[in-house]
Amino acid sequence: MGTLTYLQYTNRVLEDINETTLSALSSSRGIQTVVKNSVNRAINDIANSEVEWPFLHSDKDQDTYAGVAEYSLPSDHSYVDFDSFMLFPKNLVTNGTFDSNITSWTDGSSGTGEIGFNSTGPQPPASRTGALRLTAGSSGTAIAYQALTTTKNKQYRVSFGATYPSGGDLTLNLGTSANGTQISTNTITIDDIGDFEYVNYTFTATGTTTYISFSQSVDTQVDIDNVVVSEDFHPHKLKYISYDEFQDVLKERDRGTNVSRLAIPECVYRTQDEKFGLSPVPDMSTYTISYEYWKTTTVLSSDSDTSDIPARYEHAVIAKARYYAAVLRSDTATAQASLTEFDDHMKKMRIELVNKKDYFRAV
């Protein structure tokens, strides 16, 4: 993300061509308006010059729905990497990473026990954005729980990381009620003081609602992060097939009415209308499809808008916008110098951001 605002970009170019700067873009006139429009034009030129600029990269997670084969691609996509499609079991936990709060977790503590959000201190370290903290106090029990939607008799896997400042035990309860143990109760002894210890368990759901609960009754604190509950099956990569291959080989089966068309998806294809399709058609609504794509750049409109172009390459935008202004004014010398400067910046950007080290793989 860049640091220069739309107004600052415009004024930098106006200064370069010795024109009056603006206090607000809404008051632009004549050459000022030309420069203002040229800034967006220059940003688009940069964005469109390469398919896979790192600063335009995005990740997308799409939950599946049983019986639904096709899903819309992001509205802002310019290129989708169909070799990156992976199928994962859907995480049933809401806010299991505690990036900025502990929303969706209920405090069932008693006595001096309490739960809270921890964003400072050695737990979590600087590389973490946040964690759920349980504090029992001198005479209480800290309890945090969440109700999950499950399928009866399905097997699930729960995993999470936990740490104590001074060591201790944490209890994980799985049941049909808050802090209930109807399914299982598990005691986690944490020995890696100062670091997160990761554990995982499997369980079989006994109904459509399962409660995951963490409790701690020792007079100290415990931090919990990255809580995941999902169906117990291994993620796998989806094979890309062309739309023609889907039409020739798989469409007759997938568009039929026989339930045999429903299964765990193995293939992905691109449709003719900005969607992707899965084959076989998903048999459950508990899968997540994860993939990578590159987005279109954002058009600047208000004075304070910033661009997607990284700060160290913002001079490329200024040079290309100056080029467009010089062409309009028939200033050939300035236009040529600005275009040369822009090309030099683009070479640097490609070397630093796009060029990749050669890699050879045995086949």
Predicted features along the sequence, with ranges:
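Extracellular glycan-recognition surfaces and repeat-rich motifs
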Residues: S100-L132
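Extracellular carbohydrate recognition and processing domains
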Residues: N179-T208
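Extended, low-complexity, turn-rich repeat/linker tracts enriched in Gly/Pro/Ser/Thr and Asp/Glu
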Residues: S138, K152, T163-T171, V218-Q221, ...
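Surface-exposed coil/turn segments at beta-strand junctions on protein surfaces, enriched
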Residues: S127, S139, T151-N153, P165, ...
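Glycine-enriched, solvent-exposed interface loops adjoining structured elements
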Residues: M1-G96, T103-T106, N186-D195, N226-V363
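Extra-cytoplasmic beta-strand recognition segments
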Residues: F98, L132, T141-L170, V199-F203, ...
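Short, surface-exposed beta-strand/strand-loop-strand elements in extracellular ectodomains
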Residues: D169-G180
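Extracellular beta-strand ligand-recognition surfaces/modules
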Residues: L172-L174, N200-V227
